[in-house]
Design a protein with these regions (language model features):
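A short helix-turn-beta junction within AAA+ P-loop NTPase domains corresponding to the substrate/partner-engaging
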Residues: 158-171
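Conserved AAA+ ATPase core "coupling" helix
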Residues: 176-184
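A short beta-strand-to-loop transition that corresponds to the Sensor-1 phosphate-sensing loop
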Residues: 146-150, 173-176
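Short glycine-/small-residue-rich flexible loop motifs, especially phosphate/cofactor-binding loops
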Residues: 133, 160, 180
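Phosphate/diphosphate-binding loops
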Residues: 184-200
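Ser/Thr-centered flexible coil motifs
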Residues: 1, 83, 175, 189-191
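P-loop NTPase motor domains
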Residues: 1-141, 145, 154-157, 197-202, ...
Length: 207
């Protein structure tokens, strides 16, 4: 309830309400929310936790308006060099931005999520990705998730439903430690199982 009230007040200071036309208004940033929380009884701890995202190391990424247009034919978001603590937050923020744009302007798109297991480690992230997997077709969106380790991906209860909602599944060479899980998950025959164990890396199998 405290956070809900803080969010309402944060948008209100920017003259943004549920009934207003806010398309031309500047949206608030995290530091605006922090300022409101500091003045609300019982919200002091939340304000303190936000501080490292508004004035600390991560402020340059999170405490600013979104400025990435999605109009180009190819848009790449790289989080490779981010601190490990920030990666799940960054991936979630990026996917949320993309998903909002997809629903607002409907046209054929392809969303590729590499290292998807990072997002699957967190309940809110896996739930979000499953929601996209189930609803993407409605908005002319194709979703591709990529993960090097099936076991990490399936560690989340949402992993198998995401795979089930995939119309095409591509399997590369697998490690002996993971092959039994892969066989069970994808209903592979023994021949297919051993093919994945013996497959060469980066070479045409006909060579």
């Amino acid at each position: 309830a405290v956070l809900d009230e803080a969010l309402i007040q944060t948008y209100a200071i920017k003259d943004i309400t549920p009934d207003s036309d806010f398309s031309s208004k500047t949206p608030p940033v995290l530091s605006d929310l922090q300022n409101i929380l500091e003045g609300l009884t019982g919200a002091e701890s939340m304000a303190i936790r936000l501080k490292k995202y508004t004035t600390g190391t991560f402020a340059g990424f999170l405490n600013m308006p979104t400025n990435v247009p999605l109009d180009n034919n190819l848009v790449v978001f790289s989080i490779r060099d981010m601190e490990e603590e920030l990666r799940p937050i960054a991936m979630y923020s990026i996917l949320n931005h993309v998903w909002t744009s997809v629903r607002r302007v409907q046209k054929k798109r392809l969303l590729i999520v590499d290292e998807a297991w990072w997002l699957m480690k967190y309940d809110i992230g896996s739930e979000f990705l499953l929601n996209i997997a189930k609803r993407a077709r409605k908005y002319y969106l194709g979703l591709t998730t990529i993960s090097q380790d099936v076991q990490d991906f399936l560690a989340s209860p949402k992993g198998r439903p995401i795979i089930t909602n995939s119309s095409i599944q591509v399997l590369m060479k697998q490690s002996p430690a993971a092959i039994d899980v892969v066989q069970q998950t994808f209903n592979l025959t023994d021949a297919e199982k051993y093919y994945l164990l013996e497959a060469r890396v980066g070479l045409n199998q006909s060579q």
